[in-house]
């Protein structure tokens, strides 16, 4: 689950991580009141959306008066901001962070991520702050330093000091930087984060180390024990189809193609998308119905897939282990009737009760194309949507 920058800073502040003073605003008048509450003569007006690249897209403004704060707020609120992370449709700005301006002396990058190679949390940092860390990793990977953290003991202060010296934090501020990183790690672990990025971490002219920006993502599987974090959820920033899918315990991610996919199991779902692309098609979604799908779940999955206007055909690829093929077949038939499906539909069933499942499809009298294998199914749906 993603949260807004200002919410991330609220979380970090509780762990002793230094952040600029700021307030959220939903209207231009609220923006002015927020500026009046800050003891600063320079203000930063920042669009709050769940995407990076806001600065380059014009979503971050520097105001030198409260009149400018109001003008920028009126300009940004309601505007659709398009960044490299939003996609071409962009995201509408519905709230702003009004923050005190900082005298920035130097920018750095600090982040915590889960590293699959080591199965541990890794602290990453770079002297190249303020730019996309992916660009740094691609062009100058030697400028990124890492510390692998032992989960038995957690981040140690000597590791944080090592990082601080490696990215050339001024010696007199290393103590502050260590405190910053230790607090960031504590927030990461206690709040079940999957990513915590500070870009940039800044050293200010008056000798402070603070987070100028903060990106925190959380493990959705752990939200049952993070009620305070769950309250930060902003449904306006999420895909309506993904919200609807979550109501039925369906794992759905919207993509840019035109072939809707309904599969059981994340691995099979990814393989299905790969083989569709292999045969020249483009998947419209990732949709995992899980191991305990019912006819109702299958029907809702169809409705969600068809709510995407780009979908020109559907490929159902099921391997029945815990899930029975006849149950899926009944769900497919019921869903096809309920939604009045007119698009091409290819179904591949394999596993438990597969013969019964195929018989249900054949006896339905519906225009359903059966496939004998995943490759056969992918080829058929790709040819049908062309």
UniProtKB/Swiss-Prot annotation:
Cofactor note: Binds 1 Mg(2+) ion per subunit.
EC number, UniProt record: 6.2.1.5
SUPFAM superfamilies: Glutathione synthetase ATP-binding domain-like, Succinyl-CoA synthetase domains
Catalytic activity: succinate + ATP + CoA = succinyl-CoA + ADP + phosphate; GTP + succinate + CoA = succinyl-CoA + GDP + phosphate
Chain positions recorded as Mg(2+) binding sites: 199, 213
Family of the protein in this entry: Belongs to the succinate/malate CoA ligase beta subunit family.
NCBIfam families: PRK00696.1, sucCoAbeta
Protein name: Succinate--CoA ligase [ADP-forming] subunit beta
Organism: Bacillus licheniformis (strain ATCC 14580 / DSM 13 / JCM 2505 / CCUG 7422 / NBRC 12200 / NCIMB 9375 / NCTC 10341 / NRRL NRS-1264 / Gibson 46)
């Amino acid at each position: 689950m993603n949260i807004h920058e200002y919410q991330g800073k609220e979380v970090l502040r509780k762990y002793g991580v230094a952040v600029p003073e700021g307030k959220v605003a939903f209207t231009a008048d609220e923006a002015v009141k927020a500026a009046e509450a800050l003891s600063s003569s320079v203000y930063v007006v920042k669009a709050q959306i769940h995407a990076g690249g806001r600065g380059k897209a014009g979503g971050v403004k520097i105001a030198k008066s409260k009149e400018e704060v109001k003008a920028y707020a009126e300009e940004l609120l309601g505007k659709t901001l398009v960044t490299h992370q939003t996609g071409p449709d962009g995201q509408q700005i519905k709230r702003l962070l009004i923050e005190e301006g900082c005298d920035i002396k130097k920018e750095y990058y600090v982040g915590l991520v889960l590293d699959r190679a080591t199965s541990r949390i890794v602290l990453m940092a770079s002297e190249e702050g303020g730019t996309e860390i992916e660009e740094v990793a691609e062009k100058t990977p030697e400028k990124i330093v890492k510390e692998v953290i032992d989960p038995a003991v957690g981040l140690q202060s000597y590791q944080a000091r090592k990082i601080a010296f490696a990215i050339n934090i001024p010696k007199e501020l290393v103590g502050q930087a260590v405190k910053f990183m230790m607090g960031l790690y504590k927030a990461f672990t206690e709040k079940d984060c999957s990513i915590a990025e500070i870009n940039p971490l800044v050293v200010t002219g008056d000798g402070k180390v603070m987070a100028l920006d903060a990106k925190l993502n959380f493990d959705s599987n752990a939200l049952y024990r993070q009620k305070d974090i769950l309250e930060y959820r902003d449904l306006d920033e999420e895909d309506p189809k993904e919200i609807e899918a979550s109501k039925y315990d369906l794992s759905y991610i919207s993509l840019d193609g035109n072939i809707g996919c309904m599969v059981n199991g994340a691995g099979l779902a990814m393989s299905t998308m790969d083989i569709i692309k292999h045969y020249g098609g483009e998947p419209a979604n990732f949709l995992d119905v899980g191991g305990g799908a019912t006819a109702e779940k299958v029907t809702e999955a169809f409705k969600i897939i068809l709510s995407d206007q780009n979908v020109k055909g559907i490929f159902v690829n099921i391997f029945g282990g815990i899930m029975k093929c006849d149950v899926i077949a009944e769900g497919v038939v019921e869903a096809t009737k309920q939604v009045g499906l007119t698009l091409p539909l290819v179904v591949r069933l394999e596993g438990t009760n597969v013969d019964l499942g195929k018989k249900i499809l054949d006896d339905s009298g519906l225009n359903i194309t059966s496939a004998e294998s995943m490759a056969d199914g992918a080829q058929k749906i790709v040819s049908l949507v062309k």
